[in-house]
Regions:
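Bacterial N-terminal signal peptides
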Residues: 8-18
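Bacterial N-terminal signal peptides that target proteins for export
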Residues: 1-9
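Basic/polar N-terminal segments that are highly enriched at the extreme N-terminus
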Residues: 1-2, 19-21
Length: 152
C-alpha cells in the first residue's frame, strides 16, 4: 500500500512539473466567440500560467487559422507584443469551429555533455541515453535542434 501511495505521489509531481515546463501555449479569454467579432490570442512562451518572453513574428515559420475548410495566414500587423507576451489580434468570420496553429522556426542550442544526459533522463528518452552510453558518447557535448508547435 505504501508503495502505491509513493508511486501516486511521484506521478502527481511529474504531471505537475510537466504543466509548468517551458513551452508554448495559446490562450484566449473565451473559447466561445460570436461570429464576426474581434478577439485576442495570447501566445504564452514559458508556462501555461506565465509567459517569460514574447515571440516575434520573425521567429514564426507558420501562423494559420483554419475554419470551414479555409486556411488564413495572419500577417505581421496582426501580432503585437509587450515584454513577455505576444498577442494575435484576430476576427472571426461565420459561426463555426476555428483552429489556430502556430509553429516557430527551428533553433539549435549547445549543451554540455552532463546537461544533455540529464535532459535525456528528464524528458523520458532512455533509449537515446542508452545509445550514447553504448557508443561512448556520454562525455561528448551535444547540440539540440528544436521548434515549438501549438494549436488551440
Amino acid at each position: 500500500m505504501k508503495k502505491h501511495v509513493i508511486s501516486a505521489g511521484l506521478l502527481s509531481l511529474s504531471l505537475v512539473a510537466s504543466i509548468f515546463a517551458h513551452d508554448l501555449f495559446l490562450k484566449t479569454d473565451s473559447f466561445f466567440l460570436k461570429p464576426n467579432s474581434k478577439f485576442t490570442v495570447r501566445v504564452m512562451n514559458g508556462t501555461f500560467l506565465e509567459s517569460e518572453g514574447a515571440v516575434t513574428f520573425a521567429r514564426l515559420s507558420d501562423v494559420s487559422v483554419v475554419s470551414g475548410g479555409n486556411r488564413v495566414h495572419p500577417k505581421e500587423a496582426d501580432l503585437s507584443k509587450d515584454e513577455t507576451t505576444a498577442f494575435l489580434n484576430l476576427t472571426t468570420g461565420a459561426a463555426g469551429t476555428y483552429v489556430i496553429g502556430l509553429s516557430t522556426k527551428s533553433r539549435e542550442i549547445a549543451l554540455k555533455a552532463a546537461d544533455f544526459n540529464e535532459y535525456l533522463k528528464e524528458d523520458g528518452l532512455p533509449d537515446t541515453l542508452e545509445e550514447r552510453r553504448k557508443t561512448g558518447e556520454l562525455e561528448e557535448d551535444a547540440k539540440e535542434r528544436y521548434a515549438k508547435h501549438v494549436k488551440a
